[in-house]
Curated annotation (Swiss-Prot):
GO terms for cellular component: cytoplasm. InterPro entries: At5g52880_ARM, F-box-like_dom_sf, F-box_dom. Signal peptide: none annotated. This is F-box protein At5g52880. Residues 109-155 form the F-box domain. PANTHER family: OS05G0526300 PROTEIN.
Amino acid sequence: MKRYQNLKVGEAFSKNRIYPFACNELSSILNLAYSLSPKNVKALIFQDTLSAFRLLPDINTSAAVSAANLLLKSVEAVLPKQKKNLAIVEFKQAKVALKRRSKNREEEDIDIPSLPQDILIHIFSFLEISSLVSSAQVSRSWNQATHENSLWQSQFDLHFNHKVLIRMQSDIDWREAFKKAYIAANSSEALRSGRGYCSYCDSIVWHENLRCLNKQCRLKSGNKPLDLITTHQVVNYLLGIESSDDESESDDEAFPGRLWKLSYVPDYL
């Protein structure tokens, strides 16, 4: 039970950016670990599943809806009849709430004040990537501001400069460079999990821009990127299973031996 609580899956459903990652992880836990888990852990998994559906209307992004639909499929395939029916009811209520809120937004006439482009660009320079992308959909002037090359150069430096060497030129389209690097990086299963190992927390954590959410950890580490781990490794940690021989060396390095040893503590609580 302690290992599942350490993962803090349920806490992620209230966070817009992390919600899809948490749904995908919970779906994998249902598929791979639910039947092997003790009753108290099953109860926590079920409660987190209900929370995921209940909080969906508050997130209301296409990525969140897609992830919630994936979670629903796992619910239908894994949970016993009574729990499955309760979860399905919660999901249907969430969908109704989503439609109601979308309709209300369409009926509202929102007058977005027009700000000078230089002020918008300055504001957008403080946004993380998902918020920057979302801002482009608000209005034409906001969309124009989000195309500012310097914004994407900063995002590129933050996410990829430690991994990708790029020949410096004055005419680089940083938005396009970021897009290509992002697509290439997302081929990594570890990056798609939203998880990393923080040596300062000594635990598996959700990451923000590849950094621990804990401000103190970021300060102690000099804001260095976390060691990323895959959803499969998260499930293995939950079950107390060591990495298989066929996993890549990078996966093993990203999941330190000390944490593997912790996973073998008897889970009687």
